[in-house]
Amino acid sequence: MSLKDPIGAGSAASIDGAPASLDEAAAAAAQLLSRSRQPLIAGLGADIAGTRAAIALAGQTGGVIEHMHSAALLRDLDPMRETGVMLTTPGEARVRADVVLLVGDGLTEAWPRLNERLLTPPARPEGVEVKRRIVWLAPQADASLANFDGDIEVFAAGAGVTLAANLAALRARIKGRRIGRTEFPFAALDSLAEILKGARFGVAVWTAARLGALEIEMLHGLVRDLNETTRFSTLPLPAPDNGAGVLAACGWMTGFPMRTGFGAGAPVHDPWRFDAERLVASGESDCVVWISALGAAPPAWRSAVNVIAVCESTTQFAAEPHVRIAVGRPGVDHDAVMHSPDVGTLVAVAASAPSGALSVAQALERIGARLGKANASPC
């Protein structure tokens, strides 16, 4: 299926591919939502204001909120709410860490400024030197860390060995326990264990986009073991598309993370039930509001789903959305509040190239304002 051309630069909205006014598009979107069995507010690639508006719209329609990177976000969140975790900030890790344990791959893709903002120690007063060891538990022996040319000690096992198995063996050796046969060389395993145990302040870094739930759980257990004799913490890299910011906004507005539904009149969280892919594939959701103001490509939803796209004007779809409203990019076209991986919290971002483009919040508020009128219309 060929990609449909994005709407023209001069068009702010369209209905079934035909240019429309913003009011017409908002009214058409409201009609689709009011007739939906279970609206799905998905993507959620937005700033904090856009996220709040999306949650409000889900509450107004009895819909479901779901971020495009929910699976990875929840893999990092689950250990926190089940057993508790040790966490640090990028700034503290950069200043204090004398041992940095990198785990798995995809790290510089998850945080392009990883080298600059974490792995490179900050400038210190003359005569003050803090030695830092960077060790990498790599997925394979020939792995390389993109955009990093500093000293790094790579530890990798043979082909076909899972990272979870390596972590289990490493955790056992840190505790001084015997292990059975492993593809991880014993000498290398014990060397890595001694490096971690010898840390004065260590930090484990990974991205949940590349690790499974068991591997993340194992990492937190390893860090707990290390804290019996030294200081060690974790720095999970945040998901793209303001994933950590959306997670925070969902928490303070609903008490739950994403994958939360409002059909019962109050927020209900269910990671399986409210998985966007499952909802669309099963037909439980027949109308999707796809929100993406940060450049992420849309999924190829099946044609039976009514799609309301709130995205950048250049976004391309496999099939033209029923309703499309163009919005600007947060921090570029308009001021925004978003999660910053550099500081590990929400920050205000001034628009770098202010324009008259709508924000996600403004677009969703227009739709929400039309919902009462849509519900009052005769069938």
For the regions a language model picked out, list residue spans one by one.
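Non-catalytic alpha/beta scaffold blocks inside enzyme catalytic domains
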Residues: 77-231, 257-379
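An N-terminal, well-structured beta->alpha segment
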Residues: 1-30
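A broad, structural surface signal
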Residues: 27, 31, 52-59, 220, ...
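Short glycine/proline-enriched coil/turn segments at helix->beta-strand junctions
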Residues: 34-38, 61, 303-304
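Gly/Ser/Thr-rich loops at beta-strand to alpha-helix junctions
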Residues: 19-22, 28, 35-53, 105-109, ...
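Anionic-ligand anchoring segments at beta-strand to alpha-helix junctions in alpha/beta enzyme folds, i.e.
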Residues: 40-95, 227-265
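N-terminal start-of-chain detector that recognizes signal peptides
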Residues: 12-14, 71-75, 109
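Short secondary-structure boundary/capping segments within folded domains
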Residues: 30-33, 91
